[in-house]
Amino acid sequence: MFSSIGWPEIFTVLILGLIIIGPERLPKVIEDVRAAIYAAKKAINNAKEELNGNLGAEFDEFREPINKIASIQRMGPKAVLTKALFDEDENFMDNFDPKKIMASGTEGEAYRERGINPQPAGDSASPQTPSNKESQPKAGFSWDDIT
């Protein structure tokens, strides 16, 4: 409520109070203001306790949905989807976590290993490079393309 009030404003109010009220009466006024704030806080807390004591049972049915809405507002999108769709089964949504997918062994890892350890040249599984001049692609324009 008073988060925008800083030390310069407080100092200004004290100086104005000193000028308007006077140095003789200022300590008594500060003590009275402090006592009034304390009495107001005490009255508010007593009213809260009385309302909670007298009407606590009737308001319990309202507190549960309000607390549920407040907990949903504090959740992130992943937690809300998990709660709504999968009855809070966290493991199901963790299966779709991209960080875990990339960290686990996938086909991408096998592909990277194949690139690091190439197969021997004499292996029959590797494709042979064609030695025929016609089958190799040519760069640019050629009369062979037209005829």
Curated annotation (Swiss-Prot):
UniProt GO molecular function: protein transmembrane transporter activity
Composition skew (Polar residues), residue ranges: 125-134
Keywords (A to Z) from UniProt: Cell membrane, Membrane, Protein transport, Translocation, Transmembrane, Transmembrane helix, Transport
Record membrane topology: Single-pass membrane protein
Gene3D superfamilies: 1.20.5.3310
Keyword Transmembrane helix on entry: yes
Membrane spanning stretches: 2-22
Function description: Part of the twin-arginine translocation (Tat) system that transports large folded proteins containing a characteristic twin-arginine motif in their signal peptide across membranes. Together with TatC, TatB is part of a receptor directly interacting with Tat signal peptides. TatB may form an oligomeric binding site that transiently accommodates folded Tat precursor proteins before their translocation.
Quaternary structure, from the entry: The Tat system comprises two distinct complexes: a TatABC complex, containing multiple copies of TatA, TatB and TatC subunits, and a separate TatA complex, containing only TatA subunits. Substrates initially bind to the TatABC complex, which probably triggers association of the separate TatA complex to form the active translocon.
Protein name: Sec-independent protein translocase protein TatB
